[in-house]
């Protein structure tokens, strides 16, 4: 069984849409464009018989088949497709909490592991101040070169955040990393949090 949940309300709604397509055996295909990146988008498309890919995972529902894209499937873990009625009729929603989370392991390249921890552990905390940090480069000495943005750019606490928060977390998670360096122009204090 797939990691995605399609509620009964969503299944009923989609079955009604599919019945209007006048194509016997038509189903849906669920996929994510740019999975594991900040630009990931979860999509549902009509899937006529034969349009599915051989590596897709079929999920047999009562009145149609949902084909899950093989590349997207790990990013669809805990995803829920639902349909909620409202005064305007209703709305199909797709919640895929892992769509933008990169899939990394200890064998992944260093820059991918750094980006993973920046996105999953560091940036959620910085977001409360309207800020974020991104990886610019990893230099030969094993130093991650980072750039602050948003409320962190020009913030008086950026040095403390860099050394006591970001560097400690990254060194703990990635032993071969030797340190971090900030290349942000902090003279621009327009959006600074502190």
Swiss-Prot record:
Binds 1 [4Fe-4S] cluster per subunit. The cluster is presumably bound at the interface of two monomers. It comes from the Bacteria. The keyword Metal-binding applies. Pfam families: Fe-S_biosyn, NifU. HAMAP family: Fe_S_biogen_NfuA. Involved in iron-sulfur cluster biogenesis. Binds a 4Fe-4S cluster, can transfer this cluster to apoproteins, and thereby intervenes in the maturation of Fe/S proteins. Could also act as a scaffold/chaperone for damaged Fe/S proteins. NCBIfam families: YhgI_GntY (TIGR03341). This is Fe/S biogenesis protein NfuA.
């Amino acid at each position: 069984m797939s990691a995605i949940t399609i509620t009964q309300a969503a299944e009923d709604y989609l079955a009604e849409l599919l019945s209007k397509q006048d194509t016997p055996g038509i189903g849906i295909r669920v996929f994510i464009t740019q999975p594991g990146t900040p630009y990931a988008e979860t999509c549902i498309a009509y899937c006529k018989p034969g349009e599915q890919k051989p590596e897709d995972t079929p999920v047999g529902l009562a009145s149609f088949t949902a084909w899950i894209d093989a590349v997207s499937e790990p990013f669809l873990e805990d995803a829920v497709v639902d349909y909620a009625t409202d005064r305007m009729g209703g709305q199909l929603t797709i919640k895929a909490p892992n769509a933008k989370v990169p899939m990394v392991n200890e064998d992944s390249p260093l820059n991918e592991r750094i980006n993973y921890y920046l996105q999953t552990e560091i940036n959620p905390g910085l977001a409360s101040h309207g800020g974020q940090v991104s990886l610019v480069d990893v230099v030969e000495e094993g130093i991650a070169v980072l750039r602050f943005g948003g409320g962190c750019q020009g913030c008086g606490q950026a040095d403390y955040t860099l050394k006591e928060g970001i560097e400690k977390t990254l060194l703990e998670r990635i032993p071969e990393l030797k340190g971090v360096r900030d290349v942000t122009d902090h003279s621009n204090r327009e959006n600074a949090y502190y």
